[in-house]
From Swiss-Prot:
Recorded superkingdom: Bacteria
Function noted in UniProt: Binds to the 23S rRNA.
Matching InterPro entries: Ribosomal_bL9, Ribosomal_bL9/RNase_H1_N, Ribosomal_bL9_bac/chp, Ribosomal_bL9_C, Ribosomal_bL9_C_sf, Ribosomal_bL9_N, Ribosomal_bL9_N_sf
UniProt source species: Lactobacillus delbrueckii subsp. bulgaricus (strain ATCC BAA-365 / Lb-18)
GO biological process, alphabetically ordered: translation
Keyword Ribonucleoprotein: yes
GO MF, any single term: rRNA binding
A GO term from the CC aspect: ribosome
Pfam families (UniProt xref): Ribosomal_L9_C (PF03948), Ribosomal_L9_N (PF01281)
Family: Belongs to the bacterial ribosomal protein bL9 family.
Keyword list, A-Z: Ribonucleoprotein, Ribosomal protein, RNA-binding, rRNA-binding
The protein's name in its UniProt record: Large ribosomal subunit protein bL9
Length: 151
């Protein structure tokens, strides 16, 4: 019996895959557990539609990430932050990814999730810092952050 796997089944098939399996296994286990559906014309058309929607959504997310990358890599996109610092240019506190995200939103209207910033440790010195950003699978950029002394 041909079935369409709705979920990954170890040793049998992956989600969305159409495979031939024994009748008893398909009817008594896969279909009853909701792991697969019978591969008839209607279900195959539904599978094609779902795959097309997923691909379109993936492409839309990738295009949005590319647009944000363009904005981040523009010359004028530098996040300006102020912090109290000592005479040796070391900050009394630190600049976290949350503050960088807030600065991006306030200054440029770019909304990002703080988990997309790959800041290994908070910024603790005055000056310019490049912070890597992973926007999407295969789409990476850098945010330039300029920390100045607060009066």
């Amino acid at each position: 019996m041909k079935v369409i796997f709705m979920q990954d089944v170890k040793g049998r098939g992956k989600r969305g895959q159409v495979k031939d399996v024994p009748n008893g296994y398909a009817q008594n286990y896969l279909i009853k557990q909701g792991l697969a559906k019978e591969a008839n014309k209607c279900n195959l058309n539904t599978l094609k539609r779902v795959e097309a929607n997923e691909k379109a959504e993936y492409e839309a997310q990738k295009a949005a990430a590319q647009e944000i990358k363009k904005q981040l890599e523009a010359d004028e996109t530098v996040v300006e932050l102020k912090a109290k610092a000592g005479s040796d240019s070391r900050l009394f506190g630190s600049i976290s990814s949350k503050k960088i995200i807030e600065g991006l939103d306030k200054q440029f209207g770019i909304k990002l999730d703080k988990h997309k910033l790959e800041l290994r440790e908070p910024i603790k010195v005055l000056g310019y810092t490049n912070v890597p950003v992973k926007l999407f699978k295969g789409v990476e950029s850098k945010v330039r952050v300029h920390v100045t002394q607060e009066n």
